Amino acid sequence: MTVCSSRLAGFGHAVPDRRVENAEIEAQLGLETGWIERRTGIRCRRWAMPDETLSHLAASAADMALSDAGIERSDIALTLLATSTPDHLLPPTAPLLTHWLNLQNSGAADLAGACTGFLYALVLADGFVRAQGKPVLVVAANLLSRRINMAERASAVLFGDAAGAVVLAPSAKANSFQSQFITNGSHYDLIKVPAGGSARAYAPERDASEFLMTMQDGRAVFTEAVRIMSGASQNVLASAAMLPQAIDRFFPHQANIRIVDKVCETIGVPRAKAASTLETYGNSSAATIPLSLSLANLEQPLREGERLLFAAAGAGMTGGAVLMQV
């Protein structure tokens, strides 16, 4: 087969069993009933139990995607894991996935692209499929509950745990695939885990809160996320000479309902075409798009020829958009 493009061949997702309703967090933070939903659109999120690991959640989503694709596991040539919460700083977690999933001929690498991680992995996977003619497993997973600082309201109300996965396979059809990324490192510190890296390494005297997530300026995050997601989406649509009305389904990063609404308004994609899993699963960073994609495919299977738009923005600040055809 002459490989002309890549195609979405399989979808998977996984979430922990534990449901954390807003009432539990509102009581802990001393917030009035309904405060979280009014400001974020979130009603519930999933948090992992202490004995659950990122690798287990990622493997569950990946196993579902591989089964859905119906591709021999020995054919998978590369496994990419987008995560901000790997099992360990070293070694990477992706090789463990390939071991558990019996992907004997697959390379493996972790990607740290924050909320945009899945899009970076998707673009790299597309390039690999086109160059090598072999399928790639892309997984995005996070256990953000392990990084929440319950003393900081801005981040405590948003984040959940989830995993999503897709298999990208070679296609003889010339399916459209366009991408655009935007980075603004001047806002590098808007969302961060202050310590734990080489700049501020672990030391016993450091306060435990330094190893948890902090987001001190929610307004600036909102403004920058909308700018990046909207700008990247508009650029990728312009590159494809496509009007926003031609998009069949829009999969925005599920950061906050206000961000999703504003991006839809700005780029001109009808809100009804935008996936919405935020209410039930919260913000799981890079995992939100493949989670939404897998759930949407279960509810209403993707049809050949559909045009999909993905957009994300997150810590760094970094973000982007991908336009692809099923």
From Swiss-Prot:
Keywords, in A-Z order: Acyltransferase, Biotin biosynthesis, Transferase
Molecular function GO terms recorded: 3-oxoacyl-[acyl-carrier-protein] synthase activity
One Pfam short name: ACP_syn_III_C
Enzyme superclass (EC): transferase
Disulfide bonds: none
Example of a GO biological process term: biotin biosynthetic process
InterPro entries in alphabetical order: ACP_syn_III_C (IPR013747), ACP_syn_III_N (IPR013751), BioZ (IPR046403), Thiolase-like (IPR016039)
Region described as ACP-binding: 254-258
Protein family: Belongs to the thiolase-like superfamily. BioZ family.
Function: Involved in the formation of the biotin precursor pimeloyl-ACP. Catalyzes the condensation of glutaryl-CoA, an intermediate in lysine degradation, with malonyl-ACP to produce 3-oxopimeloyl-ACP.
Protein name: 3-oxopimeloyl-[acyl-carrier-protein] synthase
Organism this protein belongs to: Brucella abortus (strain 2308)
This protein's encoding gene: bioZ
